[in-house]
Amino acid sequence: MLAAPRAGCGAALLLWIVSSCLCRAWTAPSTSQKCDEPLVSGLPHGAFSSSSSISGSYSPGYAKINKRGGAGGWSPSDSDHYQWLQVDFGNRKQISAIATQGRYSSSDWVTQYRMLYSDTGRNWKPYHQDGNIWAFPGNINSDGVVRHELQHPVIARYVRVVPLDWNGEGRIGLRIEVYGCSYWADVINFDGHVVLPYRFRNKKMKTLKDVIALKFKTSESEGVILHGEGQQGDYITLELKKAKLVLSLNLGSNQLGPIYGHTSVMTGSLLDDHHWHSVIIERQGRSINLTLDRSMQHFRTNGEFDYLDLDYEITFGGIPFSGKPSSSSRKNFKGCMESINYNGINITVLARRKKLEPSNVGNLSFSCVEPYTVPVFFNATSYLEVPGRLNQDLFSVSFQFRTWNPNGLLVFSHFADNLGNVEIDLTESKVGVHINITQTKMSQIDISSGSGLNDGQWHEVRFLAKENFAILTIDGDEASAVRTNSPLQVKTGEKYFFGGFLNQMNNSSHSVLQPSFQGCMQLIQVDDQLVNLYEVAQRKPGSFANVSIDMCAIIDRCVPNHCERGGKCSQTWDSFKCTCDETGYTGATCHNSIYEPSCEAYKHLGQTSNYYWIDPDGSGPLGPLKVYCNMTEDKVWTIVSHDLQMQTTVVSYNPEKHSVIQLVYSASMDQISAITDSAEYCEQYISYFCKMSRLLNTPDGSPYTWWVGKANEKHYYWGGSGPGIQKCACGIERNCTDPKYYCNCDADYKQWRKDAGFLSYKDHLPVSQVVVGDTDRQGSEAKLSVGPLRCQGDRNYWNAASFPNPSSYLHFSTFQGETSADISFYFKTLTPWGVFLENMGKEDFIKLELKSATEVSFSFDVGNGPVEIVVRSPTPLNDDQWHRITAERNVKQASLQVDRLPQQIRKAPTEGHTRLELYSQLFVGGAGGQQGFLGCIRSLRMNGVTLDLEERAKVTSGFISGCSGHCTSYGTNCENGGKCLERYHGYSCDCSNTAYDGTFCNKDVGAFFEEGMWLRYNFQAPATNARDSSSRVENAPDQQNSHPDLAQEEIRFSFSTTKAPCILLYISSFTTDFLAVLVKPTGSLQIRYNLGGTREPYNIDTDHRNMANGQPHSVNNTRHEKTIILKLDHYPSVSYHLPSSSDTLFNSPKSLFLGKVIETGKIDQEIHKYNTPGFTGCLSRVQFNQIAPLKAALRQTNASAHVHIQGELVESNCGASPLTLSPMSSATDPWHLDHLDSASADFPYNPGQGQAIRNGVNRNSAIIGGVIAVVIFTILCTLVFLIRYMFRHKGTYHTNEAKGAESAESADAAIMNNDPNFTETIDESKKEWLI
C-alpha cells in the first residue's frame, strides 16, 4: 500500500469543523427554521392520556398551557408518585423545551417532575442531563409558566410527565406545553440475518477522508453495524460488543516490517436499551473523531498510512459470508437503523428506492419492529409482588437482570405448609440460592453460580427445585449449572417477591440476607408462566412499591469516564470510584499529581540531589517525567538526559546527503517545553571535534551543519554564540585558530580541532536533532557530543504579586473547570480577612476567601445551591508567614486543605447539576465591592496552569510585582547558623560564617590529613606594608592588630582517626595562654586549657570509649568565663569549671593549628610530646566562634588570606552524612510510593535511567551492595590519593562564570556575555574602529 503524507493539526481542525456542521445539520431540521414551535396546544383531547383523573372536568385533555377549559387542568384521583400525564404527537418530533403550569386558579401545582419519552408508548426513557435522570424544577403557583430549555434535544412521539413533588397545601395539578419541530427519517429494520451492501461503482474505493453517520437502536448486545475491507489488509468495522460500541480500523500494515495498523477504540455503554443512538465517524488521514450521542472521542490510527482502500462494497447490518473466520464468528446486527449516510450518500434512501440489493437471507423492512420484553426498574425501596400457583411440588422461576451493585435481593418466596422459604440473591457478584428448611434436620441449603454479574449486562437466572433436587443455571450455560441432591420437600407458596421483600421493609421478623435490588429485570417467569407486568401495573393481580414498569433507567456512571490519567472506574448504583494505582495521580478522580512540579519545590521540602519524578503542569495533560535535581548550588539545576551524551563519530558516504543524528530524551518535547518555559535560565553543551570537516562554513557560506531545536526549527549558530549570529564561540571571542573564520573547524585543517560551548537561548532548546555535513571527503572525520539539558530556577514557584490595598484586584480570563477544577497557591497576610479569588456565572460561582484569622472558606454553586467548605486552623493564619491552600472540585466531591491541616471533603449529590458554568472574568484579590485581600499571593495554579501574577501586576496600576519576606517562612531551612537572605524570586542561605556548605548550610566541609600535614589560621591578618611589618614585635602583640581577648569561645568539629596520640586542634596566643584538643595514647580525648592564674593547665579527660577507632566523632566545647560545657557524639552534655584561681580571659589569640602545632617559643610539654609525627585522619566542619579555618582553606572566602597549609589538602566529609531537613513520614510524603516500583512503573517517556528515590529497600540486596560499595570506595580513594600526589602541582581551577565587558576580548563577546538572548547579527560592517 502506498504511504501518504501525515495529517497534521489541520486535519484535526478540519474534523472539528466538519463535526460541528454535521451535528447541526442532523439536529436542526432546517437552517432557516428555529425548532421552537408549540407542539401541544393544537392537539385533540384524544392525544392526551393519564394514570387517572378526579373526574371528566379534570381529564388530561384540559392540560394545555394557558387554557381554562374543564377544571382548568389535569388532576389525578390520587396525589402520589405513581401518577403521570402523557401526550401523543401522532408522529416523531424533535423536542427542544418543555413548560409547565398549575391548574388554573387553584392551589394545585407540581413543584418537581420528570420527563419520559418514547417512540411507541412503551419502553420509556427518562430525560438525562449531567449524567443523571433529570428532575425539572416545577411551579411555585398555579398561574406562572416555568419553561426549561433541554440541554440536548430529544426525538420522540410520546412524552410522559411524572410528578415527583407538588404543593403541600393542594394536590397535583398540571398544564403543559412542549416545544420543538417536525422530524422525519427513513428507517430500516434488520432481522439479524439480512445484510445491506453498498457496492462501489468502480469496485474499489480509495479515500483520504471519510464521514459516516447513522442512528441505531437494538435490544441485542452483539452485532456488526457496518463493515468494509480491502485485499491489501485495510478494513473498517463498527460493531456492538457487550452493549458497547467498538470501531476497528486498519489503514494498512506491512507484513515484512514493523508497521502494524490495527486500531480499535471502544466507547459507550448499555447500548442494548432499544433506544436511538447516533454515531458519527469522521476521518482525515490518520485523525479520527468518533462521536456517540454527542460525546466525541478523538484518536489517531496506528501505522504510517493515510488512505483507506476498500474493495467492492461496504455493508451495513453485518458481514457477508466469505469463508473467512471473521465473517462467521461475528453476529449480524438485529434492530433498526435510520439516516445512514456514507460520504454524502444516503444509504437508507437508496434502500427504500430499491437501488441496493440486500442479501438473499433474511428480510429487510422499513418499519421498526419493537421487542416484546417489558422491563421493570427497581430502586433501593422497591419490590414487585406477583402471584404463584399454590401447593405445587415444582418450584420454578426465571428472569433476566442487570445491575451495577454486587449485592442485592432478587427473589424471595415462602413455601406452603410452613416448609421453609427460598431466597435468590446477588452476593459478591454471584447468584446464590438459600433454601431454609424447617421440616428436616438440615436447616439450610446453599448453592451459588456465576461471577462478575454486576457488570451492567443482562444476565439470565433459572432456578428449579423439586423433591430432593435443585438446579441453578446462569446465562443458559447448562454445562456449568449447579445442582444439589440434598433432602428437600417442596410446596410452592402463593406469593413471589422480586427485588425486595415487603416484610423486610416493615421490619418483620422474616429477614433476608441481602438489601433490596437496584437495577432492572425482564422476562420474569413464575411456575413456567410469563408474568404480565401490565396487569401487575394495574394491581390485578399482584402489587408493587416504587417500581417503574416498562422502563429500565440504569445509568453507567463510568461513561463518560471521569477517572483521569487512565484511572480505573468501578461503580455501584448511585456512585463511582476511581482506582488511581500506578497512574502517578491521586484524588477522587485521579486528578492531582503525587509529584512536585519542579526540582525547586523538592529543594524547599529539604530533599537532596537525586533523581526525582516531577510534574511540571500538575493536573494538566503532560504527565510526570524523571529528571535529575542537582541541589548543590543556591539555584537548583534540573537535568533532562538523552541517549547521545557520549561522543559519537559521524560518518557519511554520500556528498549529497547529510548525516542526521536524532536525540531521544527521557521526556516528551511538550514536557521539556514546560520545564524551559518556567525556568529562569537553560543551557545545553554541544561539541564538534573535526578534522577536515567544516561546520558553519563561515564567514559567508551556507552551513554544512546545523541543529534543530524546539518546534522543529533549524538553527545555524553553535555553542557559545547566540541566535542570528552564524558563529562559534571562538568567533565571538575572536580567538579562532584562523582569524579569517568564525569557527575553528571552518579552517578545514588536517589536524583535530574543536568548536564547543553552551547553547543558552532557552526558547530554542532543547537540541532534538543535529544534521552534519562535510564528512564524506577523503580524510574527513567528525565527532559530535551533546550534553543534557540543564535548567535553573522555577519562575512559576516564585511568581507572585503584592496586593497593597483591599480594593485592588487582578483580572484574568474565565476559569475553565466545568467538571474538574483544582486551585492551589501560597498566601501571606497580616489582615484577618479578604477574598483570594472569585469567578461568577449566570448562577454558578466559585470563591476562595479568608473569612477570619483562623478560617479559610471555599464556596461554589454548580446549580444545586451554594456549597461552602471551611477549614479552621488552631493558630492564626494572618501571621505574615507563607500558607498553602489547595482546593478541588469535581463531579464526585469537593475538598479544601490549608497547609498540613486535615483536608475537609464534601461529597457531591448523586443527582443534580455537575457542570460549573462561569462567564465573568476571574478576579484575584477580590472584586464586586467585597472585602479584598491585603497581602501577597504566589504560585497561583489553576488546573495545572500557573497564572502570571507578576506580569499582570506590572501592567495594573497600584500593584507590586513579586513579594518580600520569604525568610520569615523559610529562614529555618538555613541550618548550622546559616543566614537567610531575601531574593526577588525566593531566598538563599548565606553560609559564610559557618563551617558548612550547600544550599541549606548542611553539607560538611572537611579534609583528609596525611602524616606531617598541618593547617594554620592566623587571627591577625598578614601585614600589608613595610610599616606594619616593622612595627610587629614577636611575643609583644600590637593591641590594634591582635585578636581581642576572649571571655568565651565555642569549638565545634568532627574527626576520625586510627592513630594516637595526636593533636587535633591547638589555639596559641601572643601570651602563654593556649587551648588544645588532643587524643591521648589510649585513644581517649583530652582538652587542655591554660588561661593563666594556675601553675598547670586545666585538663578535661573523657572516659568514653576509644576515639581513635576510625569512626567519625563530633566535639562541641563551649566556655563562658569559668564554665565549660562539653558534648561528645550522642552522649549528654557535661559541665566543668575552671579552678577559682584561673583567669577568665583568653588573652590575645594568635593562631589556630589543625593536625600539628608549628609555633615558635615555649610549648607545653604534653603538646610537644604528642605533636610528632602529627595527626593522620579526617577533620570536618571545624569552627572556632565565627571562624571556619578548613572552609577558608578549601573555598575562596574573605578569610582565605589568613590560612597557610603544609601539604596537599584533600577534601572529604569524613564519612559523615550531610545533615538534611527533618524527613517527612511516609504517610505525608507525596513521593513515597511503597506500592510502585520504579523499575516497573509504566510512565510515558521513561527510559529507565536513574532511580526515583525509594524509602524501602531490600535488606539482602542492601548488605551485598554495601560490601561491594566499600570495596569500590577503597579502590577509588587509593587511586585519588595517588593521582593527587603525582599531579599535586598541576591543578587548575575552571569556572563557567560569565565574563563581563571588562574581560571580554571583543564587542561580540561582551554583548553575548551580558545578554545571551541577543539576536542581532554582528558583522564587520557594524564594528567601530579608533583611528
Swiss-Prot record:
Residues 1284-1331 are cytoplasmic. GO terms for cellular component: juxtaparanode region of axon; membrane; paranodal junction. Glycans are attached at residues 289, 346, 363, 379, 436, 506-507, 546, 630, 735, 1116, 1198. Residues 187-368, 373-552, 799-963, 1023-1214 form the Laminin G-like domain. It is found in: Membrane; Cell projection, Axon; Cell junction, Paranodal septate junction. Disulfide bonds join 35-181, 336-368, 520-552, 558-569, 563-578, 580-590, 936-963, 967-980, 974-989, 991-1001, 1178-1214. The modification Phosphoserine is found at residues 1303, 1306. It comes from the Eukaryota. Residues 35-181 form the F5/8 type C domain. It is a single-pass type I membrane protein. Residues 28-1262 are extracellular. GO terms for biological process: cell adhesion; neuron projection morphogenesis; protein localization to juxtaparanode region of axon. Residues 592-798 form the Fibrinogen C-terminal domain. Pfam families: F5_F8_type_C, Laminin_G_2. The chain crosses the membrane at residues 1263-1283. Keywords: Cell adhesion, Cell junction, Cell projection, Disulfide bond, EGF-like domain, Glycoprotein, Membrane, Phosphoprotein, Repeat, Signal, Transmembrane, Transmembrane helix. Residues 554-591, 964-1002 form the EGF-like domain. Residues 1-27 form the signal peptide. InterPro entries: ConA-like_dom_sf, EGF-like_dom, FA58C, Fibrinogen-like_C, Fibrinogen_a/b/g_C_dom, Galactose-bd-like_sf, Laminin_G, Neurexin-like. Required for gap junction formation. Required, with CNTNAP1, for radial and longitudinal organization of myelinated axons. Plays a role in the formation of functional distinct domains critical for saltatory conduction of nerve impulses in myelinated nerve fibers. Demarcates the juxtaparanodal region of the axo-glial junction. Interacts (via C-terminus) with KCNA2. Belongs to the neurexin family. This is Contactin-associated protein-like 2.
